[in-house]
Amino acid sequence: MDNVAEMPEEKYVEVDDFLRLAVKFYNTLGIDPYETGRKRTIWFQIYFALNMFNMVFSFYAEVATLVDRLRDNENFLESCILLSYVSFVVMGLSKIGAVMKKKPKMTALVRQLETCFPSPSAKVQEEYAVKSWLKRCHIYTKGFGGLFMIMYFAHALIPLFIYFIQRVLLHYPDAKQIMPFYQLEPWEFRDSWLFYPSYFHQSSAGYTATCGSIAGDLMIFAVVLQVIMHYERLAKVLREFKIQAHNAPNGAKEDIRKLQSLVANHIDILRLTDLMNEVFGIPLLLNFIASALLVCLVGVQLTIALSPEYFCKQMLFLISVLLEVYLLCSFSQRLIDASENVGHAAYDMDWLGSDKRFKKILIFISMRSQKPVCLKATVVLDLSMPTMSIFLGMSYKFFCAVRTMYQ
């Protein structure tokens, strides 16, 4: 008999495909952001505990160094650099703490995403354009994550690289051993083998803070893109809705049945949005406060004479923070536009020949769409592109105040 080659089964997109990169960053810290049914070993929990201990220890050492430098009025620049690092660590710690505290809510959010996600069918997933949305998700998440990792490695490796060149290649007798983030430790590390373990512990703490910040943002991007996907599909179906009231005996009832299923879908998306804001609200608020302070402090540093390596590191820092805030505002604006588009689609559809009950349901859809949804930093702030202008204005005011103090 001839051997018949089996056709490989087509792999359909799942919710995990959107969340995979964010989950990987969390896993490198020893964190499962939501319940997966996979039982972790005790070593995974020990790894998380060691990461947190190292990060908290570094945070207190960094604060102690900052206090010591603030006592010396001549070290204003170093104080600004240290304060920017402290702000970044606080942002990373707050995001890690938020995801640990909100883990049950995060699990509920992922389960809701899985419930609403298109079924594993080529026709259904094509209707939602799932592959196209996944491609966009990968572009944003990989690009953003890559930029932050470049920023981290620039801060973590440049001091060691400079020391290696001066000591090994140029044979400078007075080559200084400089730590990546702060220069005060409870032990003496200079001209000692303790320099390398100390350097590793600071670099590891920086990685934890960076990954904590990255993972939270990537999770937000992945969830928001899926919600926008659902809104876009709903608007498309409404626009292409074919009224059957005058074309079939039970056409009016069939029209109402189909529209009711779309209304139920709309309600599910709205619930998904509410749950998303409940999970990410506090991290978004803390993110904006810390980012405004970071932009201010790094901006001040760039206006002062800096060495080339410091300038490059801080420029990467500034670009990363500004891009983070811009993307959050941009995604929220797209969410606003997509939710409003549902109301426009309800008006644009061919509803003139429909039943009266059908028209009443359409009115409710349009009325609900007049209140667009967006990312909410708790009740304090609704994110949108105008929020970016507010953020830049607030950062500039901080910048002017700090610059005046320096002068």
Curated annotation (Swiss-Prot):
The keyword Secreted does not apply. Keywords: Cell membrane, Membrane, Olfaction, Receptor, Sensory transduction, Transducer, Transmembrane, Transmembrane helix. One of its GO terms (biological process) is signal transduction. It comes from the Eukaryota. Residues 1-40, 101-144, 230-278, 332-378 are cytoplasmic. The keyword Cell membrane applies. It is a multi-pass membrane protein. Interacts with Orco. Complexes exist early in the endomembrane system in olfactory sensory neurons (OSNs), coupling these complexes to the conserved ciliary trafficking pathway. Belongs to the insect chemoreceptor superfamily. Heteromeric odorant receptor channel (TC 1.A.69) family. Or49a subfamily. This is Odorant receptor 67a. The gene is Or67a.
